[in-house]
Amino acid sequence: MSVITDIADAVTTSLNAATFSEDFTAERLHQPSFELTELQSLHVSVVPKALEIRNASRQHSFWDCTIDVGIQQKVDDDARVDELVAFAEEIADHLRLKRLADYPLAAWMAIEHDPVVASEHLDQHRQLTSVLTVTYRVKR
């Protein structure tokens, strides 16, 4: 498989092996699209997003692989929104500053949490959508 797909798989495995405050099974997907009825339960999607290749030396390149971790669930109140935002931070804490057990060549570089809450999803559907964008670097 490709480097970015292998990293996304390793992120998925890492999330599924860890213990969090919420019960879920992360899935690697290319298009995390769900019907509202499916979102009664929590969905955590790991999506290969982008790849940027930069020069590292005359013979090597840095491959910066960006992975989105999406958190989605239909919510009834703001208290549940707060719980899921805290859950997203748990995931960020789990991934930051660590190498992936299933892809140790990938070095963690950064995490961005945007949107923390997608306001249009919350307003129109009472659905929380929160996205962590994680960047890993591989020297090749």
Predicted segments, located by residue:
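Charged, amphipathic alpha-helical segments and their flanking helix caps
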Residues: 1-36, 47-140
